[in-house]
Amino acid sequence: KDIYPHEERAFYSLACNHCEHPACVAACPVEAYTKREDGVVVHNPERCIGCKNCTRNCPYGAPRFNEETRKAEKCSMCYEDIDIGMNPACVNACPVGALSIIDLDADTVPDNVVQYPPGFPHMPQLNP
């Protein structure tokens, strides 16, 4: 068949995966990234020098370079909301309830959780 019309489509959130061993943290020469105890990887734009090392090294394309500010930016997992027991904005905004925050180290993980969906870079050393 031709490429169009698609018989099946899949949509993936390509926000930050907050990897266990994040490439962005390792690549940043000024430590603009920190990893919290809860696993959230936070970017500090005040420290960022705009070198783009994080954007080049993240296989998932999570950090993006903002041409206007000349600095990297990425999903913060809305850690301020998580700290007060709320969900991140993306979870609340998803119209079909497809997004959720899941602890992959928990004893029970829902059956429908897929860590490496088709087409997603397989990088077990980062443990997204």
Annotate each predicted stretch with a short phrase:
Residues 1-128:
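Non-ligating segments of multi-cofactor redox enzymes
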